[in-house]
């Protein structure tokens, strides 16, 4: 590892509610960002892939979602799974949110000297990618993007996302007081158990998954400071959505969108017909939006998946690996 890179990376011990977590971090804009490279940071001669995370139903939104794909790709690539500020590093009053993360990414990409990297972004992290591309067109760090179930930046879907996050914004003060008192730790542990069961089910408990890494990230979620940061991030989600919606996906950036059928789980489980109709409209809105984006570049592609698992990178890892190999094989 170069002396310059060694200067950037250090070991940080987090005071978790259960056990210390040793985290690999990089410092930008005066704060630490957690990342995982699966020991590939020195492999500068290999193609680079950046993995970015977004939330699932539990609102957990960290790089645990890459604990299988990451180590698999690390066999042949230089990998960086990067977490947004404050979600893992127990940074008080962290600079949270997808907007700020877009700024952080520009600094991270420069420090890591990334060029022509493939970005694979899950769920809402497309907000940061789109803002980064809009704000830093001069950087040539990214050659192509794969989005898995990205946020739909249309008026209808944005209104829906805002409604989901509204309780956090409206009740933030009382929520933060509750969290700071340690009252959310038990609930987080329950959510961790739900998440772990889902990952085990989707992977069949495959030992190729970095289960130790999953455990470390789950321990970080139990840290009260990280919990406060997560609540603060959700409370400004509406602002992040509006910021991204004010920009356009650059027509020069090839894009692959993987659209799973995860909404079908909600639709089938809903008894209220009006709510069910709204869910179907949301699903159709996504298809239309994704197809509009992928029509911008001749190399872009829209992939409709029959998988009902939102975590496509676990449920369909072989298909995703094959897709990535095809993308990387192109000049």
Where in this protein do the model-derived segments appear?
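Classical Sec-dependent N-terminal signal peptides that target proteins to the secretory pathway
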Residues: 1-23
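N-terminal cap/lid segment of alpha/beta-hydrolase-fold proteins
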Residues: 21-32
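Conserved HGGG/HGGXW glycine-rich cap/lid loop of the alpha/beta-hydrolase fold
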Residues: 31-89
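Active-site loop/oxyanion-hole signature of alpha/beta-hydrolase fold enzymes
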Residues: 81-118, 152
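Conserved hydrolase catalytic core segment
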Residues: 115-160
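Flexible "cap/lid" loop of the alpha/beta hydrolase fold
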Residues: 146-184
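Conserved serine/cysteine hydrolase catalytic core
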Residues: 209-296, 303
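Catalytic active-site module of serine/aspartate enzymes centered on a nucleophile-bearing elbow/loop
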Residues: 288, 292-331
């Amino acid at each position: 590892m170069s002396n310059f890179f060694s200067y950037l990376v250090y070991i940080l011990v987090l005071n978790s509610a259960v056990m210390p977590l040793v985290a690999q971090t990089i410092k930008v804009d005066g704060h630490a960002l957690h990342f995982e490279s699966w020991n590939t940071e020195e492999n500068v001669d290999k193609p680079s892939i950046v993995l970015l995370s977004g939330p699932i139903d539990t609102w957990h939104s960290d790089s645990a979602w890459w604990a299988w794909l990451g180590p698999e790709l690390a066999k042949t690539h230089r990998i960086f799974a990067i977490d947004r500020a404050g979600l893992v590093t127990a940074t008080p009053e962290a600079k949270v949110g997808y907007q700020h993360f877009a700024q952080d990414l520009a600094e991270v990409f420069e420090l890591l000297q990334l060029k022509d990297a493939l970005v694979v972004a899950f769920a809402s992290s497309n907000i940061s990618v789109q803002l980064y591309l809009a704000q830093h067109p001069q950087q040539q760090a990214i050659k192509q993007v794969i989005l898995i179930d990205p946020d739909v930046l249309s008026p209808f879907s944005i209104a829906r996302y805002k409604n989901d996050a509204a309780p956090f914004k409206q009740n933030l003060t009382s929520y933060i007081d509750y969290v700071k008192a340690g009252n959310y730790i038990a609930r987080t542990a329950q959510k961790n158990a739900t998440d772990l069961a889902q990952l085990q089910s989707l992977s069949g408990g495959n030992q190729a998954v970095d289960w130790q890494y999953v455990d470390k990230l789950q321990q970080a979620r139990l840290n009260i400071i990280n919990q406060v940061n997560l609540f603060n991030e959700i409370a400004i989600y509406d602002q992040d959505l509006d910021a991204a919606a004010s920009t356009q996906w650059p027509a020069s950036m090839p894009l692959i969108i993987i659209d799973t059928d995860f909404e079908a789980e909600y639709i089938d489980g809903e008894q209220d017909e009006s709510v069910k109709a709204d869910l179907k409209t949301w699903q159709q809105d996504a298809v239309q939006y994704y197809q509009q984006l992928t029509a911008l570049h001749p190399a872009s592609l829209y992939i409709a998946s029959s998988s009902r698992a939102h975590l496509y990178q676990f449920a369909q890892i072989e298909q995703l690996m094959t897709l990535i190999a095809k993308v990387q094989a192109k000049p």
